From Swiss-Prot:
This is Uracil-DNA glycosylase. Homodimer. Interacts with protein OPG148. Component of the Uracil-DNA glycosylase(UDG)-OPG148-polymerase complex; OPG148 and UDG form a heterodimeric processivity factor that associates with OPG71 to form the processive polymerase holoenzyme. It comes from Vaccinia virus (strain Western Reserve) (VACV). The active site is at 68 (proton acceptor). Signal peptide: none annotated. Belongs to the uracil-DNA glycosylase (UDG) superfamily. UNG family.
Length: 218
């Protein structure tokens, strides 16, 4: 692991080598906006903004991308809910349960699945207010997601409205699926078969499929 310093909390960002090409720009962009972000109480706390940068990218095939953290109790790991109470991760788990037949589980975490990096486009929000920090993170969000897409084969974005123009923001030719958000109304996410489709796309690209059942916690 490497680390860099920034002028505001969290003061130190620890990161895996695979993120090195974007770190100097990240530091510059963060120092420009941090004082604005940090006027608010945030979800997650600043020490957890950049926790996913500890993840390597060279072994990732799929990025599952949400829009921003839970407005309360964000852990810095997208979709993670240690007490398994958040609607989004419960819906994701039930979708994978239907796909795999696994039923006796106590939780689900995308971050423990080989080949997958869960990501949030915006890395924080004001406590209790989704998308409230979008304007501050925008340059950083674009920089980091572009870097991720240089490594993965499939980018799966959760949120049809939020991601309607995502392809315009990406430079790498990555296969992109834009699906319903797990919290979408009318149970639209239930009918979404993106997790299955991702594995078909990986096979077409001669890559190993994702074992989605690995995310279950018992």
């Amino acid at each position: 692991m490497n680390s860099v310093t920034v002028s505001h909390a969290p003061y130190t960002i620890t990161y895996h080598d695979d993120w090195e090409p974007v770190m100097s720009q990240l530091v510059e962009f963060y120092n420009e906006v941090a004082s604005w972000l940090l006027r608010d109480e945030t979800s997650p706390i600043p020490d957890k903004f950049f926790i996913q940068l500890k993840q390597p990218l060279r072994n990732k095939r799929v990025c599952v991308c949400g829009i921003d953290p839970y407005p309360k109790d964000g852990t810095g790991v997208p979709f993670e809910s240690p007490n398994f109470t958040k609607k989004s991760i419960k819906e994701i788990a039930s979708s994978i349960s239907r796909l795999t037949g696994v039923i006796d589980y106590k939780g689900y975490n995308l971050n423990i699945i080989d080949g997958v990096i869960p990501w949030n486009y915006y890395l924080s929000c004001k406590l209790g207010e989704t998308k409230s920090h979008a304007i501050y993170w925008d340059k950083i969000s674009k920089l980091l997601l572009q870097h991720i897409t240089k490594h993965v084969s499939v980018l799966y974005c959760l949120g049809k409205t939020d991601y309607s123009n995502i392809r315009a923001k990406l430079e790498s030719p990555v296969t992109t699926i834009v699906g319903y958000h797990p919290a979408a109304r009318d149970r639209q996410f239930e009918k979404d078969r993106s997790f299955e489709i991702i594995n078909v796309l990986l096979e077409l690209d001669n890559k190993a499929p994702i074992n989605w059942a690995q995310g279950f916690i018992y």
